[in-house]
């Protein structure tokens, strides 16, 4: 599962599809609102289902952040939920000493579906990254900003899919963040 039309419906679920997510983002006018930080998108090649992520992909993500570190105020990594907590934890150790946010997010229900949690997760992650108040790897999901190396997947079906049972959330998104 993942965020957006980047996933094409297959008989047994969704599969990553290059280029589709950019088109899906263009259809969300709120991403271009005046209050939103300016953003850009870099796409991994090849796209993978998160259940197929390995240390190799963690290294690629960390290198992508390092290569573009000076050009951006923060980073949002869109990731499938199956291994998002593992990736967030690994990146938190690989990218120690950050002066900028690296926020991982995704969705339980892809944005290509009528009902999806992806839009809010994406928009709120961009707002948090753009604010620049967080200086570490975090996971944002279902209204909670969690420390990357303290997050764990709690539910495969619920929209509150991640928790940090032994450490408080860094922020809660309600009327304000």
Regions picked out by a protein language model, each given a short descriptive name:
Residues 1-7:
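Short, small-residue-biased leader/transition segments that mark boundaries at the very start
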Residues 5, 79-85, 144-146:
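Gly/Ser/Thr-rich loops at beta-strand to alpha-helix junctions
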Residues 8-12, 88-89, 114-117, 147-154:
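Short acidic, glycine/serine/threonine-rich loops at helix termini
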Residues 21-33, 147-177:
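Accessory alpha-helical/coil subdomains and C-terminal extensions
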Residues 38-68:
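Glycine-rich oxoanion-binding loops at beta->alpha junctions
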Residues 77-79, 103-106, 138-143:
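Short beta-strand segments
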Residues 78-100:
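Short Gly/Thr/Asp-enriched flexible loops that form oxyanion-binding sites at enzyme active sites
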Residues 111-151:
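Short, glycine-/small-residue-rich phosphate/pyrophosphate-handling segment
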């Amino acid at each position: 599962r993942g965020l957006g039309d980047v996933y094409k419906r297959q008989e047994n679920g969704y599969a990553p599809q290059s280029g589709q997510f950019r088109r899906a983002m263009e259809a969300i006018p709120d991403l271009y609102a005046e209050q939103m930080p300016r953003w850009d998108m870099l796409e991994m090649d090849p796209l993978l289902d998160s259940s197929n992520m390995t240390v190799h992909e963690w290294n690629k993500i960390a290198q992508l952040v390092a290569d573009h570190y000076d050009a951006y105020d923060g980073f949002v990594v869109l990731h499938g939920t199956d291994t998002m907590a593992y990736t967030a934890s690994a990146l938190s150790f690989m990218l120690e000493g950050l002066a900028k946010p690296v926020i991982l997010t995704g969705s339980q229900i892809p944005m290509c579906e009528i009902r999806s949690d992806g839009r809010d997760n994406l928009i709120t992650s961009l707002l948090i990254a753009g604010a620049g108040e967080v200086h570490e790897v975090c996971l944002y999901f279902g209204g909670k900003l969690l420390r990357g190396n303290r997050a764990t997947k709690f539910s495969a079906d619920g929209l509150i899919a991640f928790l940090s049972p032994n450490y408080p959330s860094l922020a809660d998104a309600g009327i304000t963040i």
